[in-house]
Design a protein with these regions (language model features):
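Mature hydrolase/peptidase catalytic cores and their serpin-fold inhibitory cores, especially
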Residues: 351-490
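DNA-contacting surface of Y-family translesion DNA polymerases
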Residues: 3, 64, 186, 190-334, ...
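Amphipathic, charged-and-aliphatic alpha-helical interface segments
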Residues: 42-43, 47-49, 161-202
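Residues that scaffold, gate, or flank divalent-cation-dependent active/transport sites
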Residues: 1-102, 107-109, 116-117, 121-124, ...
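A residue-level signal for conserved active-site and pocket-lining positions in enzyme catalytic cores
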Residues: 58, 99, 135, 200, ...
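Extended compositionally biased segments used for macromolecular assembly or nucleic-acid engagement
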Residues: 107-110, 134-145, 151, 157-164, ...
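Structured, non-catalytic alpha/beta "coupling" segments that mediate domain-domain communication
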Residues: 84, 117-156, 215-223
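A glycine-rich phosphate-binding loop feature that marks nucleotide/adenosyl-phosphate handling sites
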Residues: 139-146, 277-289, 332-343, 381-396
Length: 490
């Protein structure tokens, strides 16, 4: 096995900074009542803010400082989101809380062209989620974790290289991991002069066991591959839900779209792992607390893609159309993205001589964009309806490909031409000259089953008007035998 450890030492900070596009200073406070700084971004640290500093001191150094209390629940959710995204690289993933992800990457090396290209790809695309991490590769998960924390970028792909890579690591790594060494054990080792792992390995194992440091030897055995280190596998969710708290409430669409892009990067990984696409997803705006007099007000936007798609640029475009269509009623405090029912994507069919000149637009994207911009009900299309009366021979239907409103069987269409532009109400005209009548008459007598008011009895003609247009006119067969124009052919 070959393990890639992805360590996020600044996860407590990045769960808040990943949703912002500007570099306002930000610091994270520890638990109450002390409320001391546990992490700060580079802008805050440039002002003198450091971990361990009190809240008042931090604000005095950086008056524009944004302070957020540490959110362990957000950190756990972020680790799960990253694990879900990492499914695009390997299906063998293990969570190693509080800030580490373990990927078993041996089967993925050929697909990504080797170990170095794979690690580069992981690090680069992690940035699209808004996170920055440290990577290392080793034959055991614990060794990979320690190397990622203390020697990021290390790539140890054989057991023979483990000892030389791990021996120089400081003693403090023993406090890192799922089963860390106790402070008493570390004090014991420091007291007898141990400074690095090589010093501990030279000590008698029996002596360590008598001094209650058995956990230390077990850690080293797992790291150096002397005993197995089984890990539970992460099972990705069947339904994708990701939430992004914003650093500060905002009603700026561009700021929201920056956060949407972060969420879509995670969705892309979830879909990649399934080789699937979506037809729709939901973007939920969580408004600022106490908006409209109560907490928890949120507004869902169902974004229809117009076709089965995995294209995040398409998703971003349609999200923009939804967010810019109407003003936001209040500042948004957080974004949430929800998606389910992914369907397998089929490879695109290409012509042997396919080229740029033969490419066509995407009608599904056009339809989805128009609906996002104008509203769902503002976009409709015409369909034939089985009725001989021209004004009732059509109807509005949903233009979606999945709509059940479109006719499915063969249609009994008239043999004579019909104009595309039909007037809502026929307009009276003078009796036309005989030479202007090009075809006809076509007699239409129908509607008696709907009552006298709906019955028509007409003779239709195709004629040329005085302004050289082709028009569709008729004469009533009932007195007073008036003439009317009903539509235009051009």
């Amino acid at each position: 096995m070959l393990w890639c450890a992805l360590v996020l030492p600044d996860l407590a900070l990045q769960v808040f900074t990943r949703g912002r596009s500007e570099a306002a200073p930000l610091a994270i406070l520890g638990p109450r009542p002390q409320l001391r700084v546990v992490a700060a971004d580079s802008t805050a640290m440039a002002c003198g803010v450091e971990p361990g500093m009190g809240r008042a001191s931090a604000l005095a150094l950086a008056p524009g400082l944004h302070l957020r209390e540490r959110a362990p629940a957000l950190e756990r959710a972020a680790l799960i989101d990253i694990a879900t995204w990492a499914g695009r690289f390997t299906s063998s993933i293990s969570l190693d809380p509080p800030d580490t992800l373990l990927l078993e990457v041996q089967p993925s090396l050929r697909l990504f062209g080797g170990l170095t290209p794979l690690c580069t790809r992981i690090g680069d695309t992690l940035g699209e989620l808004g996170f920055v991490g440290q990577l290392a590769v080793a034959p055991t998960p614990l060794a990979a974790r320690w190397l990622a924390r203390c020697a990021p970028g290390s790539q140890i792909d054989t057991h023979a290289g483990l000892a030389s890579a791990l021996d120089p690591l400081p003693l403090a790594v023993l406090a890192d991991g799922a089963e860390p060494a106790t402070p008493a054990s570390l004090d014991l080792l420091t007291g007898i002069g141990a400074r690095v792992l090589a010093d501990v390995r030279r000590l008698p194992r029996s002596g360590l066991a008598r001094r209650h440091a058995r956990a230390v030897t077990a850690q080293l055995d797992r790291a150096y591959a002397r005993i197995p280190d089984p890990r539970p596998w992460f099972v990705p969710p069947e339904r994708y839900v990701a939430r992004l708290p914003l650093p500060a409430p905002t009603d700026q669409v561009d700021t929201l779209l920056f956060g949407v892009r972060r969420l879509l990067a995670g969705l892309s990984g979830w879909l990649d792992a399934r080789q699937a696409g979506l037809e729709r997803f939901t973007l939920v705006l969580e408004y600022e607390r106490h908006y409209q007099g109560h907490e928890g007000y949120e507004e869902p936007h169902e974004i229809v893609l117009g076709a089965l798609s995995q294209d995040m640029a398409r998703c971003q475009l349609l999200a923009r159309e939804h967010l810019t269509r109407n003003p936001l009623p209040a500042p948004v405090d957080a974004l949430r993205l929800e998606a389910d029912n992914p369907n397998p994507l089929t490879p695109p069919r290409t012509d042997l001589f396919d080229g740029d000149d033969g490419q066509q637009g995407d009608p599904g994207l056009l339809l989805a964009t128009l609906r996002a911009r104008l509203g769902h009900d503002a976009v409709r299309c015409l369909a034939p309806h089985p009725d001989h009366r021209p004004e009732r021979a059509w109807r509005w239907i949903d233009p979606s490909p999945t709509s059940n409103a479109a006719p499915t069987g063969p249609l009994d269409l008239p043999s004579s031409p019909r104009p595309l532009w039909l007037l809502a109400t026929p307009r009276p005209i003078a009796r036309p000259a005989a030479e202007s009548l090009l075809t006809g008459p076509e007699r239409i007598e129908a509607g008696w089953w709907d009552g006298p008011a709906a019955t028509i009895n007409r003779d239709y003609f195709v004629a040329r008007s005085h302004d050289d247009c082709l028009v569709w006119i008729f004469q009533e067969r009932q007195p007073p035998h008036g003439w009317f124009i009903h539509g235009y052919f051009n």
